[in-house]
Amino acid sequence: LHEKINSRVHDYYWNEDFSCVVTTLKVLSELFYPRLHPQVIDAAVGLNAGRFRSQCGLVQGTLLFIGSYGCQQNIKQEQIITLCRQFGIEFQEHFGSLLCNQLRPQGFRPDNPPHLCEKLTKQAIAFSAKFILEKINPMTKLQMGN
């Protein structure tokens, strides 16, 4: 699992130049095989959390994925909302914040190298995948793809 996450994050950042939100959505969709409508990816491009320095795109991407995946698995909206809230709480407890400007290793400076959050992205997507496996998949009785 970690090997695939690490490989895909690196590829999406350095070969595709995707944002953290889009990278999160794409990697999670590859792990769990839902069909994400192209408009979901298009909408995620507009979030671009890192440039606004508010809620981390790694959180936003996972919340978008939970909503989309949950609906595809016929999980009730109320349960999806509860799962998203629970994810936010657990992410904040684990990583210390939900805010991009607090999670980003070196803050925001013009001389920052590209994809400064690659290590954090790999950790956050692994955390998100574990959350989905433990909290959402048991509700759907599905197993994660290889």
Question: For each predicted feature, which ranges?
Answer:
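Phosphate-handling active-site elements
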Residues: 31-42, 68-83
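A short glycine/serine-rich beta->alpha loop
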Residues: 7-15, 45-54, 74, 108-113
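DPxDG-like acidic metal-binding loop motif
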Residues: 61-69
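C-terminal binding/interaction regions
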Residues: 80, 85-146
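Active-site-proximal helix-loop elements at catalytic-domain edges
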Residues: 5-31
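Acidic-glycine-rich active-site phosphate/pyrophosphate-binding loop
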Residues: 24-44, 94-102
